Each structure stands twice: as C-alpha cells, then as structure tokens.
Amino acid sequence: MSACQTPLIVALDFPTRDAALKLADQLDPALCRVKVGKELFTSSASGIVETLCAKGFEVFLDLKFHDIPNTTAMAVKAAAEMGVWMVNVHCSGGLRMMSACREELAKRSGPQPLLIGVTVLTSMEREDLAGIGLDVDPQVQVLRLAALAQKAGMDGLVCSALEAPALKAAHPSLQLVTPGIRPAGSAQDDQRRILTPRQALDAGSDYLVIGRPISQAADPAKALAAVVAEIRG
C-alpha cells in the first residue's frame, strides 16, 4: 500500500538538483508524491530519482517519451528499473508504441510503475491544434487518444480536469492524472484548462499535479497542508 495518503503530486520544476531537494525536504511523503520533469532530470541525471525514493517519496517521472516503439519501450523499462511510481508517454506515438511499453513492463517480476498516456497538453487550445494540422477541439482529440490508450492497456491518462468527466464515462478503468491544478485564488500561469483541487476530484481526476502554488510559496509545507485541507473538505 502506498505511504502517500492523498492524490497530490508536487511538481519539482526546478533547474537544479539542490533546489528540488530543498523543496522536497520541506514536504511530507505521506501528504504528496513528487514529479520529476525534463529540466530537472536533464540537469541532474537519474540520480535525482533514487535520491527522492530514498527520502520516502513515490516519484512520477514526467518525461513524456515519444519515439519508435522499441526505443520508447526501453526508456520505460529503464524508468521502472530506477524505481519510479509512474511514467508517461505521448499517446500520439500511436498504438504500437504504447503497446510495446505495456508489453515490456509485463516482463518485469518486480513492481511495475503506472504507465500513463499524455493526451493533449493543458497549454493547448483549438488554435494550437489547428497549427499542427488538427482542426478539432481539444476534447475531441483527447477522446481519440484515450481510446488508443485503452486499447494498448495503459493504466491511465494525463488530461485536463475539464476532460475528466467524459473520459471517466468512456473509460472508467483509466486513472486520470490532472496538471494545471490551481488552488482558489492562484494565478493561471501558462496552464489554460484548469480547475481547483476539489473541482478536479469531483470531475473524476484521480491524481492532481500542483506546481508553483506550492513550490513558490513562502512556506511550501503550509501551502501543501492548505491544499490537503481543501480536498478533505
């Protein structure tokens, strides 16, 4: 059973290992998991994941792999060997790519990370999709990619909370991971399709990714406790 008692994932979106660990040391692994993204992972290499795991955190490795099937599957395998709790790939890589990742993880005898698909980035709106040749609403593209993810045997999806109700209705077995979460009164920053933590959970999200409202707070531990209180109502 997970040591974490909440659905919260704090994004360690920092340029250096020291800055990320400084924040992590102010957080309680029982109250949140942590997310390691491209900037931190690239600047710190794989050691950051092992260090966070040693501190008691479950780690979401948010690298959004997208490549040919074998290359992506090997990257997912490497992530699993690091001990990550969750890893993601772009659904737009296609059915064969996602299936290859699922099949590679199935070969493992030890713990398997949750394999999550990225649908449409929360910063993208219809005009952004049109710019890459997809003249559809984000919600339509999300549902298309979700169907592929379900067929490939993925564990869940990264999606906006605004898409969560439709996704839960269409694919109730998929776990939904929602970025762009902002507690009431927070700035939107560069996330467009957002909801508050309580709204996101009520909409069907299973895990909530929160970054700047906690990482840039004067007292991150206090900010985290406030979000926990908000979702527990």
Curated annotation (Swiss-Prot):
Entry binding sites for substrate: 13, 35, 62-71, 122, 182, 191, 211-212
Annotated catalytic residues: K64
One matching Pfam family: OMPdecase
Keyword RNA-binding: no
PROSITE patterns, per database record: OMPDECASE
Annotated signal sequence range: none
Enzymatic reactions: orotidine 5'-phosphate + H(+) = UMP + CO2
Database matches in SMART domains: OMPdecase
UniProt keywords, alphabetically: Decarboxylase, Lyase, Pyrimidine biosynthesis
InterPro entries: Aldolase_TIM, OMPdecase, OMPdecase_AS, OMPdecase_bac, OMPdeCOase_dom, RibuloseP-bd_barrel
Any GO MF annotation of the entry: orotidine-5'-phosphate decarboxylase activity
Pathway as given in its UniProt record: Pyrimidine metabolism; UMP biosynthesis via de novo pathway; UMP from orotate: step 2/2
E.C. no: 4.1.1.23
GO biological process: 'de novo' pyrimidine nucleobase biosynthetic process; 'de novo' UMP biosynthetic process
Enzyme class: lyase
Entry GO CC: cytosol
Subunit structure and binding partners: Homodimer.
NCBIfam families: PRK00230.1 (NF001273), pyrF (TIGR01740)
Family statement drawn from the similarity comment of this UniProt entry: Belongs to the OMP decarboxylase family. Type 1 subfamily.
HAMAP family: OMPdecase_type1_B
Main function: Catalyzes the decarboxylation of orotidine 5'-monophosphate (OMP) to uridine 5'-monophosphate (UMP).
Annotated PANTHER family: OROTIDINE 5'-PHOSPHATE DECARBOXYLASE (PTHR32119:SF2)
UniProt protein name: Orotidine 5'-phosphate decarboxylase
Source organism phylogeny: Bacteria, Pseudomonadati, Pseudomonadota, Gammaproteobacteria, Pseudomonadales
Gene symbol of the encoding locus: pyrF
